Amino acid sequence: MSTAPNAKNNISLKKSVGDVFRLTAKRVLMRVDFNVPMQNGHITNDYRIRAAIPTIRRVIDQGGICILLSHLGRPRGVSMVAGVRDIRRRYHEAQFHDNKGKTAFFSVLPGEEKVKILAKSSAREEATHISPEVKSGKTMLFARLPEDEKKSLLMQYLNENKDSALPQMSVSAGYEEQYSLRPVAVRLAELLGQHVYFAHDCLDARVEVSRLKRGNVMLLENVRFYSEENGENAEEREAMAKILASYGDVYISDAFGAAHRDSATMTGIPKILGHGAAGYLMEKEISYFAKVLGNPPRPLVAIVGGAKVSEKIQLLDNMLQRIDYLLIGGAMAYTFLKAQGYSIGKSKCEESKLEFARSLLKKAEDRKVQIILPIDHVCHTEFKAVDSPLITEDQNIPEGHMALDIGPKTIEKYVQTIGKCKSAIWNGPMGVFEMVPYSKGTFAIAKAMGRGTQKRGLMSIIGGGESAGAAELCGKLSISHVSTGGGASLELLEGKTLPGVAVLDDKE
């Protein structure tokens, strides 16, 4: 089968961090995807953090200053206006009013901190003779300073030490603890082997950013604590992007997982700075998808699974123009089987998509694409794990039973088909792989792709999401590329252009 004439490649190669020179002393804004799974404040899978390390190292090894931006989860988010109002309120509460409280506040500070404050005062010469020890005259010297100077010195101290001295200032507007990136900063520091600075509010980090030195790394707090990040109003997104863009000189994106978002950090910042380059991870994602959507080694097989046909309509339609074989699994397979007249018991079926299934089967026949559906199933009467589930003789599923995985004969046929191909792309599990009795089909696909890659150079791509998670459960596999972007990879395979990729500079 040859690629259809209207099957256009919707992705082009982009300038990468390797093409960007002279990062020394440059403040590099790097959008990463640290949207990692968390449980009780602990990271359960740090793959996305580890995947960004090579680009971070490139920046700091060249003497650049690396400022990382990311989201985590789906916090409610507050508007910038409300956020700024909240910041001002908290600062106001921390101020000293009516010439009261300044000396009292100073008096309870540690001796070392008092000495540091006095060293910046008009009485610094006198202060050089004062010891940090208790009752050496530090508070008395501070008390003699003019009220305006006292206020100025203390506000400077609070700005520089708000974590310890002013805890009410050390959280972002819109802060929700379960979505904070602070645990990510800790893990990143462990992986890098160096301190990672953490800015508690991505839109109030100007002072912290200004203190960074060459080779430093800073992670800003969750950008989705502000609703403008993914807001529908373009002007509001731009306003947020302008603040963030003011922190940096260079923009690099390594966040393929968020590349389908037209957001303040994915598209707004590079538009304002007038440039954007891909990090090593983004470059790899673009390179592999450009190959599989452009001119891949033939034959090319697409393995598509998941729960709903409706979620994969555009993918199936688009990929049908590019592939030689299509293997369908997961619950979506039962809609196709019913469309062909087979019994599916009480398995999931999208009645409204039966006509689409028939149409796709006809298109495939016309284009000489071989669609292969399950020929046996692993079933049970309920959606739960059992020691000995029913394995059907053929495509038909008995009444009162639901299929929860592809059967052994189907596994054999699918593995044989992958073995005939030179390229394979997989999106979506073959069954309910989270339950051990129904995991064999999904794991067999992952292992077949790994073996093919290792033994005969199969170009294998796993399109993120559940497929990537399933592949990781199989242990170390020799897959050419496991995408970090579930939604982004799906949209690419649907033939869509990703805003977060399109905005980057094309490779010359």
UniProtKB/Swiss-Prot annotation:
In T.brucei, three genes code for phosphoglycerate kinase isozymes, which are transported to different cell compartments. Its cofactor is Mg(2+). One of its GO terms (biological process) is glycolytic process. Its EC number is 2.7.2.3. (2R)-3-phosphoglycerate binds at V32, D33, F34, N35, R48, S70, H71, G73, R74, R224, H260, R261, K308. The lineage of its organism: Eukaryota, Discoba, Euglenozoa, Kinetoplastea, Metakinetoplastina. This is Phosphoglycerate kinase A. Monomer. InterPro entries: Pgk_euglenozoa, Phosphoglycerate_kinase, Phosphoglycerate_kinase_CS, Phosphoglycerate_kinase_N, Phosphoglycerate_kinase_sf. ADP binds at G306, A307, K312, G330, A403, N427, F433, E434, E466, S467. Keywords: ATP-binding, Glycolysis, Kinase, Magnesium, Metal-binding, Nucleotide-binding, Transferase. It comes from the Eukaryota. Mg(2+) binds at A307, E311, E466. It holds the Pfam family PGK. GO terms for cellular component: cytosol. AMP binds at A307, K308, K312, A331, A403, E434. It comes from Trypanosoma brucei brucei. CDP binds at G306, E311, G330, G428, F433. Disulfide bonds: none annotated. It catalyses: (2R)-3-phosphoglycerate + ATP = (2R)-3-phospho-glyceroyl phosphate + ADP. GO terms for molecular function: ADP binding; ATP binding; metal ion binding; phosphoglycerate kinase activity. ATP binds at A307, K312, A331, A403, E434, E466, S467. Belongs to the phosphoglycerate kinase family. Pathway: Carbohydrate degradation; glycolysis; pyruvate from D-glyceraldehyde 3-phosphate: step 2/5.
